[in-house]
Design a protein with these regions (language model features):
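Beta-propeller-forming repeat regions
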Residues: 1-60, 65-226, 231-300
Length: 300
């Protein structure tokens, strides 16, 4: 194309993003709205786009041509008023990120739908560097979600947090090892927790980070009965970071609770709306407050 102007444009009625490329004489030489961010609501013209969070032009497939890397901010909402772009794409903000790559070839740009699906499904859409690390450099977090054994995790670079690694007898699942750990990719530390049996097979996995972007520090993991049903539940307490509205790193404390049931575990979504945590909270204090939420007396 030579020298062109890159013009992103939003349809404010349907919240769809379109990209235009204009030559020096202002003629549009290429345009597209075939973007991952326009496919968040399958089969719907209306989409949850809020704003274009980041864009980069670089060669992603080593063919000597500049490709386009995009990150958009989308809302979990139902199509209400646009959220102000000062709102950070973080846990609890109602905003999540969508990454995409457009490869330049034969005078046009095209998307590899499989790559777009992978980078968003496995959380590699946090930053331009994260996407570049996956697309261009070949690193991936996919194994964190697809591994079947602890050995497979370790072989791919998963680092166990040894100070929180221990075994517990779970009433419905037997004796399992609680295996928390991290995987470093680009500038991000991805945090996961696994339950592994004595043969080394993964029985269950947890994603405590949720919509947070990076683990800042693991504060504790507790395996105790929280809801009073006689079954050990799991609480994870950590501090996480995300990119603020001005590009600065913001650190927040967060916790997750997973209740043991006959078929496995399910994550609490209600209690977290009532019990908020701060940097001054402790693991034991959170367990006490969580039990009180379920009607346990302090110290019971």
């Amino acid at each position: 194309y030579g020298q062109v102007s890159f013009i992103p444009a939003y349809d404010t009625q349907y919240r769809r993003l379109a990209l235009f490329f204009a030559a020096e004489d202002q003629d549009v030489v290429f345009k597209t709205d075939r973007l991952e961010t326009n496919s968040q609501r399958r089969g719907s013209l209306s989409q949850p786009n809020e704003w274009l969070a980041a864009v980069s032009f670089q060669d992603m497939d080593n063919d000597g041509l500049s490709d386009i890397v995009l990150i958009t901010a989308c809302s979990y909402g139902d199509g209400g008023p646009l959220i102000h772009p000062e709102a950070p794409a973080s846990a609890g903000s109602g905003i999540y990120k969508v990454g995409d790559v457009l490869f330049q070839k034969n005078g046009a740009f095209y998307r590899d739908y499989r790559l777009s699906n992978q980078l968003n499904r496995f959380g590699m859409n946090k930053s331009i560097r994260f996407i570049t690390s996956f697309i261009r450099d070949g690193y991936s977090t996919e194994f964190l979600y697809t591994a079947t054994t602890q050995k497979e995790l370790l072989d791919n670079g998963f680092q166990i947090a040894r100070d929180q690694y221990h075994s517990r007898q779970f009433e419905k699942l037997g004796r399992l090892y609680v295996v928390p750990g991290t995987y470093r990719m680009a500038e991000y530390t991805v945090f996961m927790v696994y339950l592994v049996n004595e043969e080394g097979y993964i029985v269950w996995s947890f994603q405590p980070m949720g919509d947070y972007e990076n683990l800042y520090g693991l504060k504790g993991i507790s395996c105790q009965d929280i809801d009073g049903d006689g079954l050990k539940d799991i609480m994870v307490f950590a501090s996480y970071s995300y990119e603020g509205s001005s590009g600065q790193s913001v650190v927040e404390s967060g916790y997750s609770v997973y209740y043991q049931r006959t078929a496995g575990f399910y994550e609490d979504t209600d209690m977290k709306q009532t019990i908020k945590c701060t940097d001054t909270d402790t693991m034991s204090g959170l367990v006490e407050r969580a039990r009180a939420y379920w009607g346990w007396k302090t110290g019971q």
